[in-house]
Amino acid sequence: MQEIMAKLEQLENLNDLERLRVEVMGKKGILTQQFALLKNLEGETKKTFAKELNKNKENFEKMLESKRESLLKVQMNENLTKEVVDASLFTALRPKSNGHPIYQTMDRIIDFFVNMNFAIQTGPLVEDDFHNFEALNLPVFHPARDMQDTFYFKDSMLLRTHTSPVQIRTMQSQHIPIRMIAPGSVFRRDYDLTHSPMFHQVEGLVVDEKDKISFVHLKYILEDFLHYMFGDVRIRFRSSFFPFTEPSAEVDISCVFCGGSGCRVCSHTGWLEVLGCGIVNQKVFDAVGHKNVSGYAFGLGVERFAMLLHRVNDLRSFFETDLRVLEQF
């Protein structure tokens, strides 16, 4: 058996290893034939011989497996050495993406406000009724709720209809001063040329001690922002109504399609509505437990801005994954 073990140690490939295994443990192998002799023995002689054979078999199997693992590693290293990849091999270049126009627009919006020291805040897409409606001065039977067709789940949970809940959560968790924007996806049951059931908003909120924030501050930041986005356009603020701000305003810019002279896109008014804003209603501060504070808020639809920046008439073209359209941006 020592001679077999010595032979095993000297083997250099798996084929020779398999031949030795058959030579020792095959049907006509050395150990197999020795085990066959046991039937001719009796008593202690048989017992002693069987014990010795089992020991030899066990030792051989262990050394066989150890040698197999060793040879497999050698073979693997040889294969890896041979399989060299030629990194210089020419391949057809794939066209690079420029980014989706909606996210290009969102990034541009975010960049402006980050440079103005606004922090980015995020929140859950699935919201509860309190954060999405009630805390924003929209109680259960408020008529303004009729303006929003909402995707509801069970137990008063819903897909958020705006990113305003992020403002509520931020005011609940942070102390003043607060200076934040909330970009993200929102959901409403609407789908046509200018509406999508899933779209994107960026809302902003600034809160500080009472009387430190005025409409003048809001007007300044939004005028600066709109000139940054659309260049030398005229801007006007119109009185409006939102339950969560008082006073409230909607902001228009001179039509980017006709320069303000009047066209089909602006309904021949020369103006395009781009966002809503106002001074935060005191009832909103009461809902989150803030006293003696003031602030302003604003919100805009990213798709609306993308359509104006890229002169796109049908919002749905942004979502149809038609490369002929997307490659233009």
UniProtKB/Swiss-Prot annotation:
SUPFAM superfamilies: Class II aaRS and biotin synthetases, tRNA-binding arm. Keywords: Aminoacyl-tRNA synthetase, ATP-binding, Cytoplasm, Ligase, Magnesium, Metal-binding, Nucleotide-binding, Protein biosynthesis. It is an enzyme of class 6 (ligase). CDD domains: PheRS_alpha_core (cd00496). The keyword Ligase applies. The keyword Mitochondrion does not apply. GO terms for molecular function: ATP binding; magnesium ion binding; phenylalanine-tRNA ligase activity; tRNA binding. Its cofactor is Mg(2+). Gene3D superfamilies: Bira Bifunctional Protein, Domain 2. InterPro entries: aa-tRNA-synth_II (IPR006195), aa-tRNA-synth_II/BPL/LPL (IPR045864), Phe-tRNA-synth_IIc_asu (IPR004529), Phe-tRNA_ligase_II_N (IPR004188), Phe_tRNA_ligase_alpha1_bac (IPR022911), Phenylalanyl-tRNA_Synthase (IPR002319), tRNA-bd_arm (IPR010978). GO terms for biological process: phenylalanyl-tRNA aminoacylation. It is found in: Cytoplasm. GO terms for cellular component: cytoplasm. Binds 2 magnesium ions per tetramer. Its EC number is 6.1.1.20. Mg(2+) binds at residue 246. It catalyses: tRNA(Phe) + L-phenylalanine + ATP = L-phenylalanyl-tRNA(Phe) + AMP + diphosphate + H(+). Tetramer of two alpha and two beta subunits. NCBIfam families: pheS. HAMAP family: Phe_tRNA_synth_alpha1. Belongs to the class-II aminoacyl-tRNA synthetase family. Phe-tRNA synthetase alpha subunit type 1 subfamily. This is Phenylalanine--tRNA ligase alpha subunit. It comes from Helicobacter hepaticus (strain ATCC 51449 / 3B1).
